[in-house]
């Protein structure tokens, strides 16, 4: 835990909750002592699930709070270097989560800004379709409004005109609404288990959703500007793919 930044801790906690909700078991993990005694050293996925389970960590600001905290602390007279800094700066919740649960499938971290978790879902579907694994645990987390990062990230979003300036939450929280004047900066975590068809049902679990189609592309434009015509055409292409998937069911 000490070697993870705050965002990674949030992501790992969400991931463990998702495993429970998906009915994926964690069984005792053992090792032999020098005397030949078997002792429990943790909990992990059964061997039959380990190699077929991948992990994707989706985050925009993971690890940045650790760096700012360390730089701030270095100004103090009694400063001592934190030997865990590198691991905390990397923000590799995907690797740490896989280590904790023993997931040996494909593993990566992605940053697509506000679309990170959405992109991760598309990547998970691709992995499963290509046969790289049978399931993917997606971890999505950020702590942009924490005491360490908020003054920097908040100022950055305000400078680009991307953050809402409304004083009341009711006036600011208007997703997909013409009255929306920007995003609300916050913190949180989510985790999803995306699986090949039939696996959840085989465990007696009713899936909460089905992925009919995904698409992720880039408009090759400045990151704070939108090519609305290109976005509209890509949404149409995604909907066409989803309609075909529905017809095939």
Language-model-detected regions and their locations in the chain:
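Conserved active-site "lid/cap" helical segment
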Residues: 1-53, 234-249
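Solvent-exposed alpha-helices and their adjacent loops that cap or buttress functional pockets
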Residues: 43-50, 101-103, 128-131, 167-169, ...
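Short acidic, glycine/serine/threonine-rich loops at helix termini
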Residues: 66-70, 121, 147-154, 205, ...
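Active-site-proximal alpha-helical scaffold in enzymes
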Residues: 11-23, 90-93, 108-142, 183-205
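Beta-strand segments within the central parallel beta-sheet cores of soluble alpha/beta enzyme folds
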Residues: 29-35, 46-50, 54, 107-112, ...
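Condensing-enzyme catalytic core mediating Claisen C-C bond formation in acyl metabolism
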Residues: 168-249
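Phosphate/pyrophosphate-binding betaalpha-module
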Residues: 140-179
